[in-house]
């Protein structure tokens, strides 16, 4: 009897917690739904092969968008105005060799629909640091590439969240 009562209290507490989280707009990371006006969004960039451009296209598809083949058929266009990565040395050893690097992924974008600017140019960036060991050069280059992809994914998610509020 006592055990049944404890299970009921636990279930009600869990239901209350989930209800309050849902009520405040919380949702698990994943698909951010786009409004109908953004379902046909075209991405335009000087280089569509960058980590960010690829991540943004994937994020749009995950959010339910169906990017058209050209921007004339699009309801809106995301212009990637800047997409670059800067690497700088954070610390050096006693032998004046790099011990740690910091990479910053910078993106500038805007959104328009026809002649109407929906979102003025926005600058967003992500920064990560990693240790460097020249005896493990290939592994560290791979680590940097993974960090760049992760930052591009994070930045693309931030753009999608902004698009979902338009």
Predicted regions: what they are:
Residues 1-11:
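Bacterial N-terminal signal peptides that target proteins for export
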Residues 10-14, 18:
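Hydrophobic helical h-region of N-terminal Sec-dependent signal peptides
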Residues 19-23:
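C-terminal motif of bacterial Sec signal peptides marking the signal peptidase cleavage site
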Residues 25-28:
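Bacterial signal peptide processing site
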Residues 37-84:
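N-terminal segment of the mature soluble domain
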Residues 60-64, 111-115, 134, 158-166:
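Sec/Tat-exported extracytoplasmic proteins
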Residues 79-123, 129-142:
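Surface-exposed short loop/turn segments
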Residues 138-166:
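C-terminal/domain-edge helix-coil "capping" segments
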């Amino acid at each position: 009897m006592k055990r049944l009562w404890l299970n009921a209290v636990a279930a009600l507490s869990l239901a209350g917690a989930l209800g309050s989280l849902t009520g405040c707009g919380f949702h698990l990371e994943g698909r951010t739904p786009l409004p109908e006006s953004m379902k046909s969004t075209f991405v335009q960039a000087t280089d569509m092969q960058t980590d960010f451009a690829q991540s943004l296209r994937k994020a749009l598809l995950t959010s339910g968008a169906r990017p058209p083949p050209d921007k004339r058929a699009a309801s809106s266009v995301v212009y990637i105005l800047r997409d670059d990565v800067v690497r700088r040395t954070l610390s050096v050893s006693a032998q004046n060799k790099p011990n740690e690097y910091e990479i910053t992924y910078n993106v500038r974008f805007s959104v328009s629909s026809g002649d109407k600017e929906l979102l003025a140019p926005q600058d967003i960036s992500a920064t990560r640091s990693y240790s460097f060991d020249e005896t493990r050069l290939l592994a560290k280059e791979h680590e940097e590439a993974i960090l760049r992809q992760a930052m591009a994914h994070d930045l693309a998610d931030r753009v999608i969240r902004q698009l979902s509020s338009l």
